Amino acid sequence: MANITNEFMGHDMLAPFTAGWQSDMEPLVIEKSEGSYVYDINGKKYLDTLSGLWCTTLGGSETRLVEAANKQLNTLPFYHSFWNRTTKPSLDLAKELLNMFTANKMAKVFFTNSGSEANDTQVKLVWYYNNALGRPQKKKIIARAKAYHGSTYISAGLSGLPPMHQKFDLPPPFVLHTECPHYWAYHLPGETEEEFSTRLANNLESLILNEGPETVAAFIAEPVLGAAGVILPPATYFDKVQAILRKHDILFIADEVVCGFGRLGTMFGSDKYNIKPDLVSVAKALSSGYMPIAAVLVSQKISSVILSESNKIGAFCHGFTYSGHPVACAVALEALKIYKERNITEVVNKISQKFQEGLKAFADSPIIGEIRGTGLALSTEFVNNKSPNDPFPYEWAVGTYFGAQCAKYGMLVSSTGDHVNMAPPFTLSLEELDELIRIYGKALKDTEKRVEELKSQKK
């Protein structure tokens, strides 16, 4: 048995989203995956309720994806897609994605390696498009507070999370942020969901008018805000937002990185909320996380301008060495085949009711303000006195403590501040779901006790 403390403490990695003090702690080193479970280097088994990072939808041991990678590695391990050269897996995957996305007619696919790169690409596409139309001033992008769109320069700027901006000179001046559509947290007394949506839509239009519609190029949104805590759009929100965007000739970018490929019980979040985007970003579940790959879906409206005008203003000079990597594309293509064959949205809908109802049964806990979710995505918000305006003291780290208790009992969740996210793989069995609910309950009981102790110490 390996000794984590001796072997890995003070390790050589500069880890993502990790503070310096954490480098002196024992890291959790994951060594093996099997179905809905992962195992650490000491052999401890954990139910992985975040699908890695929202991505391993088909679980950790789907042999068909491994075989697809192996077959492609033995045929053509790499070739690029520059200068009108490409590979068959990339062409086949592009065609399949265009057929699969039906919320609006898409015409072209551009491959990247991550959701961050996809959203960076979206902004460059929008800028190129407006330059091609002779509108160089139409460049600003509107995103939303609390949104997560990635961590590269542009995508981190689009993200509405202050810790991602601090010390990085972000957001850039061309990025604007409008309000987060979290009804529970931000509605006024007596305000209905539809009235809340109307107020936010009116504020969005005021922002556009104040900036000048001729300067605003696009609006980017996740159908459901994932990392922010599975924040669902309030009633009529996207209908009202899209009407404003059309009125002012502003493009809609749908960030489907988390929501896409069945997570919400529909193939895409755009299907669930009647979104008709001009551009779409997909990643994560595209390959079930087995290979790094993402894609940008481009509507006919935009692609026709780019293709026709590039002969006049110059080529769309953007791309990555690994854009359309043949192995990643082969794995993604097999994942999409599995989603179709297994009718994955039906699978999600069959287990999501018990998942949602089983966990929302804990909503009466005195330390929980809201449990919200849809499909196989759910978030628990810990607050004092069940009020969004009364958070626990930061140093109490209530969400972090809950996550640590879950890990102690053999379950991994994502704890960000005092909200805890769960997005389990679609392979989750009913027995595993029972285990998930049981561990959640045990960890919650421990956390309630911990909060009571902290409150008594404060008196």
Curated annotation (Swiss-Prot):
EC number: 2.6.1.119
Tissue and organ expression note: Confined to the placenta of green fruits at high levels. Barely detectable in the pericarp and seeds as well as in the placenta of mature fruits.
Alphabetically ordered keywords of this record: Aminotransferase, Coiled coil, Pyridoxal phosphate, Transferase
Effect on the protein upon substituting residue 384 to D: In strain: cv. Himo and cv. Takanotsume; altered activity leading to reduced pungency of sweeter fruits producing preferentially capsinoids over capsaicinoids
Cited function: Involved in the biosynthesis of capsaicinoids natural products, pungent alkaloids synthesized from phenylpropanoid intermediates in the placental tissue of chili pepper fruit acting as repellant on herbivorous mammals and conferring spiciness to hot peppers. Can transfer an amine from vanillylamine to pyruvate forming vanillin and L-alanine.
The protein's name: Vanillin aminotransferase
InterPro entries hit by this protein: Aminotrans_3, Aminotrans_3_PPA_site, PyrdxlP-dep_Trfase, PyrdxlP-dep_Trfase_major, PyrdxlP-dep_Trfase_small
Phenotypic consequence of residue 377 to T: In strain: cv. Himo and cv. Takanotsume; altered activity leading to reduced pungency of sweeter fruits producing preferentially capsinoids over capsaicinoids
Native source species: Capsicum annuum
GO BP terms: biotin biosynthetic process; gamma-aminobutyric acid metabolic process; phenylpropanoid biosynthetic process
Pfam families listed in its UniProt record: Aminotran_3 (PF00202)
Catalytic reaction(s) noted: vanillin + L-alanine = vanillylamine + pyruvate
Family matches, as Gene3D superfamilies: Aspartate Aminotransferase, domain 1, Type I PLP-dependent aspartate aminotransferase-like (Major domain)
SUPFAM superfamilies: PLP-dependent transferases
Chain coiled-coil ranges: 430-457
NCBIfam families referenced in this protein's UniProt entry, alphabetically: PRK06105.1 (NF004767)
Family: Belongs to the class-III pyridoxal-phosphate-dependent aminotransferase family.
Effect of residue 210 to K: In strain: cv. Himo and cv. Takanotsume; altered activity leading to reduced pungency of sweeter fruits producing preferentially capsinoids over capsaicinoids
PANTHER family: ADENOSYLMETHIONINE-8-AMINO-7-OXONONANOATE AMINOTRANSFERASE (PTHR42684), GAMMA AMINOBUTYRATE TRANSAMINASE 2 (PTHR42684:SF10)
